[in-house]
């Protein structure tokens, strides 16, 4: 069924690409739609905020630590030592029982002159039409499947080459349908391309996403079409699976990537797996494995370059010093990568070993509700 949906998805957009005039009309229509949605939300906020009790939640997240990073057993002084890696501040809440909002800002993110929103992960408004349908607009997470992709960045110690080069936070709009039992959510979303540039801000990406929650098994699946150059697309099939048994969990992701006329499966793909086991309430173990490969001869994949084949693995311990609280922890881990990375600016290197000691905190600073 997933591959049938994917085929329909691809064929539809190839029809648009064959008719440049129609495609331009589509782009113009989406721009006007985004502007209309934003205007309607802005007009609605002052009126609806008075109809119910608004809430505000303020949260703070950070990760600092010490790294020892070596390639061919030679220490890399520019990336080793004490580091402040993440500093995030978020505000979320509701204006009433139908309209909610969320904003997350990276305080330590370098901002480009041509994009003042670079440090903003997301800022959007969500409208709950009924128990099944939600509409959202603003800067959002582009809905690509997979549990590595879905994790908060401060929770990732070892990541795939794909994860290191993707830009998941983009302006767009989405519609989500939740089933009656609440176990599945289906989302359709249109965003800026994950590869948009200052010279091409009007490139787009199209996403269909399924999030399932079935107790021992959870899923984050998607099919995606991402414009990597004007009128040229790369497609993703992302299959994220999570299995929970007692104190153990396994996240297993597979992603296949293909541009037009490429061999469909396994030429350009990634596999990510993470295993977690809670030995006791205040001590946990984790292990991680990633594999990225691109055996195509095109430049369509901007995340895993043609000619790349990289394997990485590692593991460590997590200590929770505050009893019955997982929002503060200390982590010690080690990872190793090997293979060929054809991206000169890539994150993973051949024969690279990293030892990481990290302190993480997710602090809930404020929760307020109007009386």
Predicted regions and their residues:
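Outer membrane beta-barrel
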Residues: 51-66, 78-193, 212-213
């Amino acid at each position: 069924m997933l591959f049938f949906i994917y085929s329909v998805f691809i064929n539809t957009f190839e029809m648009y690409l064959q008719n440049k005039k129609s495609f331009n009309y589509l782009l113009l229509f989406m721009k006007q739609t985004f502007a209309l949605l934003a205007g309607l939300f802005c007009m609605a906020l002052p009126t609806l905020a008075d109809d119910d009790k608004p809430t505000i939640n303020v949260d703070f997240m950070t990760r600092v630590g010490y790294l020892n990073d070596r390639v061919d057993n030679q220490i890399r002084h520019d990336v080793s030592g004490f580091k402040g890696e993440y500093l995030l501040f978020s505000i979320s809440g509701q204006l009433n029982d139908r309209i909610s909002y969320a904003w997350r800002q990276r305080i330590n993110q370098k901002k480009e002159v041509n994009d003042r929103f670079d440090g903003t992960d997301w800022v959007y408004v969500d409208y709950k039409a009924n128990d099944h349908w939600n509409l959202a607009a603003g800067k959002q997470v582009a809905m690509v499947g997979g549990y590595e992709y879905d994790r908060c960045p401060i929770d990732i110690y070892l990541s795939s080459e794909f994860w290191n080069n993707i830009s998941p936070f983009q302006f767009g709009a989405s519609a989500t349908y939740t089933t009656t039992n609440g176990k599945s959510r289906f989302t359709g979303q249109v965003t800026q391309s994950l590869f948009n540039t200052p010279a091409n801000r009007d490139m787009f990406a199209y996403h269909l996403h399924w999030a399932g929650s079935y107790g021992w098994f959870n899923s984050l699946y998607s099919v995606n079409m991402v414009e990597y150059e004007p009128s040229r697309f790369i497609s993703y099939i992302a299959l994220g699976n999570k299995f929970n048994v007692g104190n153990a969990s396994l996240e297993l992701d597979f992603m296949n990537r293909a541009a037009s006329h490429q061999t469909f499966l396994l030429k350009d793909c990634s596999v990510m797996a993470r295993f977690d086991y809670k030995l006791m309430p205040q001590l946990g173990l984790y292990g991680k494995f990633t594999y990225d490969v691109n055996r195509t001869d095109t430049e369509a994949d901007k995340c895993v370059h043609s000619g790349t084949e990289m394997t990485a693995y590692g593991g460590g311990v997590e200590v929770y010093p505050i009893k019955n609280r997982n929002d503060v922890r200390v982590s010690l881990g080690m990872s190793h990568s090997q293979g060929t990375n054809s991206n000169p600016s890539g994150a993973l290197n051949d024969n690279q070993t990293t030892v990481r000691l990290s302190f993480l905190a997710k602090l809930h600073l404020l929760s307020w509700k109007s009386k």
